[in-house]
Amino acid sequence: MSDNQNKPGKPAAKPQSKYPVNMTDTPFPMRGDLAKREPQWVKQWQDQKVYEKIRKASKGRPKFILHDGPPYANGDIHLGHAVNKILKDMIVKTRQFDGFDAPYVPGWDCHGMPIEIQIEKQFGKNLPTAEVLSKARAYANEQVERQKKDFIRLGVLGQWDKPYKTMDFGNEADELRALGSLLEKGYVYRGLKPVNWCFDCGSALAEAEVEYQDKRDPAIDVGFPFAEPEKVAKAFGLAKLPTNKGYAIIWTTTPWTIPANQALNVHGDLPYALVNVVRNGVPQLLILAADLVGTVLQRCGLTGETIAICEGSALEGIRFKHPFADLDPGYNRESPIYLATYVAADSGTGIVHSAPAYGIEDFISCKSHGMRDDEIIAPVMGDGKYASWLPLFGGLTIWEASKPICAKLDEVGSLFKLVMFDHSYMHCWRHKTPIIYRATSQWFAGMDVMPKNQGATLRETALQAIEETEFFPSWGKARLHGMIANRPDWTLSRQRQWGVPMAFFVHKETGDLHPRTPELLEQIAQRVEKDGIEAWLTLDPKELLGADADMYLKNKDTLDVWFDSGCTHQTVLRGSHKEELAFPADLYLEGSDQHRGWFHSSLLTSSMMNGRAPYKALLTHGFTVDGEGKKMSKSLGNTLAPQKISDTLGADILRLWIASTDYSGELSISDEILKRVTESYRRIRNTVRFLLSNTSDFDAAKDLVPVADMLEIDRYAVAQMNAMQAEILAHYKVYEFHPVVSKLQMYCSEDLGGFYLDILKDRLYTSGVTSHARRSAQSAIWHLTHSLLRLMAPILSFTAEEAWAVFASPDVNTDGTIFTHTFYQLPEVSDGAALLAKYTLLREVRNDVTKQLEEVRVAGGIGSSLQAEVELKASGDKFAALASLDDDLKFVLITSQAGVSQVASAEEESVVVTPSTYQKCERCWHYRADVGSHAEHEGLCGRCVANLFGKGEARRFA
């Protein structure tokens, strides 16, 4: 396709005239036909190894590294993928054009649950682990190839023949080495802690894998019976209680946690009331927050009287019976009151029941009061069922147990109120099912653990790294800061098969790691480098441990997949692609959800390994929504596939839509929006076609007119493009694309189509073919085209390449692509600033004249503007600007005659339009007094005779 050179001009296919104008043509078609042509360019880029040519051309330049956040290798790409990849491509290309060496190495995230689920669906749940791994690897490779093809079709240039994959053996090995580094530095520990747990996954979840959906649960007020009435009396300053029958009242939406209750929490500084009530004819005492007495009594349908008040701190240590203590000896235990600052009196009862196995705050509170790990009651198993040893409810799932638990509470008189409650609740992002906090033994990276070098904690290092990072948009900084400041320790371990193993040997009795763990991890990494993670599966411990093997177990946990992608600054930037890339990256770019995903995990791993962020800047984009602002989903039927858009409208339309949308918010798309984008594209394409057509008989080596020798309006056009290019490059530098598109559209439709090219047509079409006047215009157009094609190439990559193949001369287009070039260095215009000011004024006048001409035309006074003669009265700078054009003023106004006279003030200024009384020249269509004055050419005006048969007309300004 690239041999489609802009051949010397030829008359367009119109009826031959006796006096033809210079109507040149171009092989660059008016219709883009993008869906058909773009795949041909994709093939040409691949066949001619354009990406390799770009790398060769930019060797030695300063590097710009955009590190690709890896999409997950499962399923076809959707519109969100397209937005992400095209934004990255546009940024890489702008930096490349700006004089950097900007490589792009795409990557894929390959381990984890979704692929494991696919293998289970296809082959069943009972496959041997070795088969799961081999089939998962094959499946991931197949998905990578599918996605790769679609990404390439979008016009994204990159190292597609050597991407990175987190499942590459070298990456898996380097990930183990990274784990070893964190272990040696003292960040990694093993402990019992409540973690996000999905019953369907059968595994812990990362924070980024949790989403919130509405859920309906029983909300219950529950009484914990007094076990130490004397201490209650003392706390409230009473000699004796009126009755020993009483309850501490709690409120919860998780009845299933009641069997695991081990404590109650109050706030030490809040006032608590002792309330006397009669319930079912029996006097009873209730303890609850003083500020909530009225609300709780009303909710429970009770009336009562507050007989005493004390501060929460007075209740510390008082014990209460478990509600089921009288039903089964297994619940014959007491729950002490602990003080906790997280307790509030704005809802509930002001007393919080604490099940340390199923709540982070509960766990922290109980541990801080001396509870040992082996004392924590944890009856919920990994599949969501209660263990068989749990009295009354063993074998039930926690969700189906809610009803019998509430029934038993009612039976013993501890259920004060039950209502169904709708609230936002944690769900697994994969299965869309509710999850819980569940205390299990896991491996963690400690946020506040003192590392072995006695330096800053992980939290401190990461927060400092955020301060040193640039954010686009700026609000991303506060968002990431808040997440890091408040997050719990990172659960590194998962209970799955398809993932990088936490390849530890754990002592059977003590649970300690083997003393040679760092050395062993390196030996295992070397095996993984050769055979993949399968090497750990098949490893006989005796091969590495010798006689110690009988004392140790192979750890079965795998690493969180967020650790996989979060380590790519180490495994890719400094590992598999260290020759092409570099650490730290200049930019990470992903959707705004990645503040808790890839941005987050990458920051944590790099803070531990390197003491800094792996990126200098973070850029986030919003999500795609339909034309009405609704989230896209298959169920709503409002999705648009990028493949379909490319195959019908063309990828350049998709690219232009992305570039023209402010990606910092939601990106709206619909057929109607794409229709408007297509119209916008046509305007740009038609402008490019005009430029190509009118330089098709122009050879810059012979015909280029120096800027200083150009006509004034041509110098203005070059100066204006210089100013606009500077503005566009400033936007590109800060990753802003929608202002670029807006400026390009305005430039093509208003600056060129509505002014400069409109004026230029007369000179291009009617001046002598090789005249200075025409060559001056073509020289300006030649400069503008060089600049315009490169400015639009990062966005409209296919169209710019197609136009470049037509426009660029063989000596310039040595690589056969626009993408090995840099932004065009436009020539300086010595009087550029003055010309910009002057022509800004002239354009204002021209707009006024055009309005007057239109009024006369509508009234039937004239046909076209060339049928008019205009007399202007102007004052001050306006008069000076108009008068300076002399006889060329008529060309700027596109009238057959124009004159200007000076007046003293703006109030006296006027525009007078008069229909011409002269004949129309059959060639230039001007109405002139000298039409027919040449006997041999009766239909021509004097200037056309001069342009065709003489020295040509003299033009200085326009």
Swiss-Prot record:
Question: Where does this protein come from, organism-wise?
Answer: Janthinobacterium sp. (strain Marseille) (Minibacterium massiliensis)
Q: Which CDD domains match?
A: Anticodon_Ia_Ile_BEm (cd07960), IleRS_core (cd00818)
Record key words, sorted: Aminoacyl-tRNA synthetase, ATP-binding, Cytoplasm, Ligase, Metal-binding, Nucleotide-binding, Protein biosynthesis, Zinc
* Principal localisation: cytoplasm
List positions binding L-isoleucyl-5'-AMP.
590
Binding-site list for ATP:
634
Q: Where is this gene product found?
A: Cytoplasm
**Name of encoding gene:** ileS
Official protein name in the record: Isoleucine--tRNA ligase
